[in-house]
Amino acid sequence: MTPLSSPLSQYCQTVVERLPEGFTETSLSAQAKSVLTFSDFALDSVIAHPEWLAELESASPQADEWRHYAGWLQEALAGVCDDASLMRELRLFRRRIMVRIAWAQTLSLVDDETILQQLSHLAETLIVGARDWLYAACCREWGTPCNPQGVPQPLLILGMGKLGGGELNFSSDIDLIFAWPEHGETRGGRRELDNAQFFTRLGQRLIKALDQPTMDGFVYRVDMRLRPFGDSGPLVLSFAALEDYYQEQGRDWERYAMVKARLMGDNDDAWSRELRAMLRPFVFRRYIDFSVIQSLRNMKGMIAREVRRRGLKDNIKLGAGGIREIEFIVQVFQLIRGGREPSLQSRSLLPTLDAIAALHLLPENDVAQLRMAYLFLRRLENLLQSINDEQTQTLPADDLNRARLAWGMKAENWPQLVGELTDHMANVRRVFNELIGDDEADTPQEEERSEPWREVWQDALQEDDSTPVLAHLADEDRRQVLTLIADFRKELDKRPIGPRGRQVLDQLMPHLLANVCSREDAAVTLSRITPLLAGIVTRTTYLELLSEFPGALKHLIMLCAASPMIASQLARYPLLLDELLDPGTLYQPTATDAYRDELRQYLLRVPEEDEEQQLEALRQFKQAQLLRIAAADIAGTLPVMKVSDHLTWLAEAMIDAVVQQAWTQMVARYGQPAHLDERQGRGFAVVGYGKLGGWELGYSSDLDLIFLHDCPMDVMTNGEREIDGRQFYLRLAQRIMHLFSTRTSSGILYEVDARLRPSGAAGMLVTSADAFADYQQHEAWTWEHQALVRARVVYGDPQLTSQFDAVRRTIMTTARDGKTLQTEVREMREKMRAHLGNKHRDRFDIKADEGGITDIEFIAQYLVLRYAHEKPKLTRWSDNVRILELLAQNGIMDEHEAQALTVAYTTLRDELHHLALQELPGHVAQTCFSKERALVQASWRKWLVAV
């Protein structure tokens, strides 16, 4: 055993003083002093349980003692009689065994591979032990779940990630997926339950038993987000549902995650074999699949962006050359060739590395370096986490913990440890880049083109100076460019830029100026880019991004030249610069039906319990997607209808995620309303009105929302802090509003307007579906029925969605007096015009003026309300373009008129989109769009002016 270093020997005195009476420096073995000096977690544990220290002193932990964990836990649970005592025993058992593992690891009594095995087996033992106890308890309460033939159904648990691979780290959370085989009902209990309900309740109790903090701590943080559909999907799925999902919808990243999936309990029963056989074809393709490399490259890019976003420095997991890159290297070979090479199908990394070497897929020296780096990094990670039982991969900044790690890694001092770490990570990065990396580099031609601009940047030319590279610019433009450069340099003098930042900036600016100043609009473009540069000069990582990736720099220049809105967004949120790295995604927005899945994958990297990071991640995702939509709009690859479609699908994905976050937080606090115990879903819906309801969102649109529930009276929640069910839904809606409007460093998510709810701002924030129907039928004004034409459910249970759709259809198909309706719609339009009148009389307000967008919307709404009782099909859509289509199809409006109004409508909306990209108000010269305006005004007179 290595003696304690000098700083640790001094700290040891403090440790001894904290121990209970009976423990003195002389009574402690050298081993005990070393472990307790190294790990505050071990020290706190033996202070609370001195008998554990005596146990360790008398008999050291053994390498194979993991084989006894199940038996030891069975003994510990023998006296458990309820969930509370189960939770206590699980927590104490986990802590006792973790102290033993920390002891063995710190003193190197057991090799590092075995430590990973012990940590994984401990987690598996606790999961299986808790599941089995709770399964029996649930069966006593509700009966045994059976298939139609009466065969009992088990709960199968897939351990994902490092747990599945047998490589769990010291303070890891656990990723799980729950499944059961076949549908059916419980038998033999006090009351029958559908199998789905039984297993959902069992799953909820199991998560609580493992995850909920008590006075004894928690067992493991449980993350269920890898299951199909993530948090918005069922907690437990049948085999049939799992198979359907992975065959029809499984994404690449889910395939990679499934490589390490392992059934907890290592059962070899028929159900377990069936589940393994079902999943294998999804994970390992029969053919050699080289598309994996680009997919993994994209995933690595996402992680690199996350490191930049969150400012993760000295991160041995996610940083360049870290643990994640070794995992990616191994997964490349597993996913490309695993279908044909069974030896590559191992869940564990080190055996797979051996297979890669045996198949000669990597040079022997590379494999040896990766193995050494992996074991070095995993030991360092585990030691780091065992200091405080804390889930971290970031190297410490304080002297004590640095001294601890240096000693634990058998280095003379901290600099020596950092040197060894740097060498290992450099070896990993080299192999990773050769296999997966795609770093760009400047061509010799680029360097030659940029060289003359070095003089412009470094010599600080004056306004009246002349230089050949600026000769092509007009005098005024040349003066503006030189002034901008000079002003930017003055601004830099006020900023605390380090030597590395200066070096990167001096490397970047000649390339940037060469690209900007070759343009005719050089002065305008440079004026938009310099504020962005001023904002990132103290964040060297972003300067390096632009310097090292010439393609990203070119896209930055092109987008800033095209749109001041994009330039402003990039300046405000520099993390968006990451989006410029891949032109394939930059100008190709996410598929309209894939926003939810992309967001789900994005949020998986953020701890579920970290509300602040979750809020940031939502905002960052939205901004990145907005940038991609705007880039495609500018490039002309998205027509106006598609721009709005994408903005609307993005908003719906955001609503879905916000409701999920709010729901999770509320249920953790109060439990869920008891009426949901007997059914699937949440009994809650979000209805989108206006531009959201009509699929017509713009870049800066707010969201018009109302909230509905179907909670009966006198229902309470089932949590420890009981509240009235309707109060729960009110607080849920308030929480949703809060999550949307909270301002973080990345801004707000959306402005939300809930005033279209029954009784407006004076009404309840959330309304029961029955009360909503009653209000619409007996109290709502005509303008509220107009608003309903453009309303649809954007989040909600199928049951509530159907209920809302029925109310909407009933209201719109109500027979109305034509003259009265015409008068009321026309008068409402005149009131709006008076209230929102154009302040620029010499300009045409595209939205509000006569012949503008709002007139077209009112014409469509009027005709639906006027004729839907005769033609119910008019109620099908909530967007103006398809409503105009329906009016023509149903013989209400002449087809030529409907097409002409549609063209006018899309033309005007297209102009609004482009004005927004230029950060210009929504009005133009009076001479613009005269043809469209005349056509709309003629249609208005035809339908809405009394005759």
UniProtKB/Swiss-Prot annotation:
Adenylyl transferase: annotated span: 450-947
Cofactors (names): Mg(2+)
Enzyme class: transferase
MF (Gene Ontology): [glutamate-ammonia-ligase] adenylyltransferase activity; [glutamine synthetase]-adenylyl-L-tyrosine phosphorylase activity; ATP binding; magnesium ion binding
InterPro entries according to UniProt: GlnE, GlnE_rpt_dom, NT_sf, PII_UdlTrfase/GS_AdlTrfase
GO cellular component terms, semicolon-separated: cytosol
SUPFAM superfamilies: Nucleotidyltransferase, Nucleotidyltransferase substrate binding subunit/domain
Keywords: ATP-binding, Magnesium, Multifunctional enzyme, Nucleotide-binding, Nucleotidyltransferase, Transferase
Enzyme Commission number: 2.7.7.89, 2.7.7.42
GO annotation, biological process: regulation of glutamine family amino acid metabolic process
Keyword ATP-binding assigned: yes
Top-level taxon in the UniProt lineage: Bacteria
PANTHER family given in the database record: BIFUNCTIONAL GLUTAMINE SYNTHETASE ADENYLYLTRANSFERASE_ADENYLYL-REMOVING ENZYME (PTHR30621:SF0), GLUTAMINE SYNTHETASE ADENYLYLTRANSFERASE (PTHR30621)
Family, similarity comment: Belongs to the GlnE family.
Physiological role: Involved in the regulation of glutamine synthetase GlnA, a key enzyme in the process to assimilate ammonia. When cellular nitrogen levels are high, the C-terminal adenylyl transferase (AT) inactivates GlnA by covalent transfer of an adenylyl group from ATP to specific tyrosine residue of GlnA, thus reducing its activity. Conversely, when nitrogen levels are low, the N-terminal adenylyl removase (AR) activates GlnA by removing the adenylyl group by phosphorolysis, increasing its activity.
Protein name, UniProt field: Bifunctional glutamine synthetase adenylyltransferase/adenylyl-removing enzyme
UniProt organism field: Salmonella paratyphi A (strain AKU_12601)
Taxonomic path: Bacteria, Pseudomonadati, Pseudomonadota, Gammaproteobacteria, Enterobacterales
Gene name in the database record: glnE
